[in-house]
Amino acid sequence: MTALKHTPLNAAHRALNARMVDFGGWDMPVNYGSQIEEHEAVRTDAGMFDVSHMCVVDFTGSRARAFFEYAIANNVGKLKTPGKALYSCLLNPQGGVIDDLIVYYFTEDFFRVVVNAGTADKDIAWFNQLNEQGGYGLTIAPRRDFAIVAVQGPNAREKVWATVPAARAATSELKPFNAAQVAGTPFGDLTVARTGYTGEDGFEVIVPAVHVEALWNALQQHGVRPCGLGARDTLRLEAGMNLYGQDMDDTVSPLDAGLAWTVDLSTPRAFVGREALERDGTRAAFVGLILQKENGKAGGVLRAHQKVVTPHGEGEITSGTFSPSMQESIAFARVPTAVQVGDTVHVQIRDKQLPARVVKLPFVRNGKVLAA
């Protein structure tokens, strides 16, 4: 049996009596007590997540932009100002999703990418293959000397500034999906990005691994609540954000995973997977579901892999949970394209088919319930 990998905050999690689980080969905290309270902290105040299992990869070289024009499905032409970030899928030639990731542009010869933990080795091998085959001449460097802390919630930015005063000047005017580099802090040189995976405002802070425990402890002293993977999952589901390996993988097109907005077909740019996407088009709708209540009670909880029965054929739930913000059972589902928002479908839960309403994603954004 392979030993679990540890982030630099592993001892800090254990000191907080976190319940630890195997998450894709990493020893990670699922909660530190009440998962519901952790969820609520992010929706109403500020919570923080150790996301150091995710991998920072730096790309340097004069043809970095040309490389990303070909390598990813979204258009790096949108990256014009230093620190601008772009969410995209990395596709295989069949149009399947190798990973979803964020690309940061700093200079024409320096781009930074953050990839998912479970796909990091696969992603880096693919990047190296594309770099070699295309003769781009880039240096591709995984940066395991970095850790990442995501601080999320309506008060997250103020609490980061209280903890790292030098970050205020560099990031107070930062728009969403932009990053700034903050040098010379007590926690080393930081990259602070106004991004996240919760549907709330906040920052994701890339910090030297040797300083991350000091930053974590300082944020806690400024009232930021440690949160685990359990709350991260309910928050991202409410926010309509996909989880790689569950809502899409290398056999699923982004067009069938609610990610058409991340694919740029508006220019003649050649990119990996484009021909397959244009040939196959959209083959399934990706929708939100809310389980209907009978006499004020839901008959179960929506979970991944449950069958969805519609008048147009069957579909499947990809992610499901009980929403603390809505007090409803919610899910994402891949269903036939004829299914429309407002329709009622039926979900197979054990031996029953229970009605669920089809809604537009997201369910919740910036603390407000959007899906009624």
Swiss-Prot record:
Keywords: Aminotransferase, Transferase. One of its GO terms (cellular component) is cytosol. The keyword Transferase applies. InterPro entries: GCS_T (IPR006223), GCS_T_bac (IPR022903), GCST_C (IPR013977), GCV_T_N (IPR006222), GcvT/YgfZ/DmdA (IPR028896), GcvT/YgfZ_C (IPR029043), TrmE/GcvT_dom1 (IPR027266). Pfam families: GCV_T (PF01571), GCV_T_C (PF08669). GO terms for molecular function: aminomethyltransferase activity; transaminase activity. Its EC number is 2.1.2.10. GO terms for biological process: glycine decarboxylation via glycine cleavage system. Belongs to the GcvT family. The glycine cleavage system is composed of four proteins: P, T, L and H. The glycine cleavage system catalyzes the degradation of glycine. This is Aminomethyltransferase. It comes from Burkholderia multivorans (strain ATCC 17616 / 249). The lineage of its organism: Bacteria, Pseudomonadati, Pseudomonadota, Betaproteobacteria, Burkholderiales.
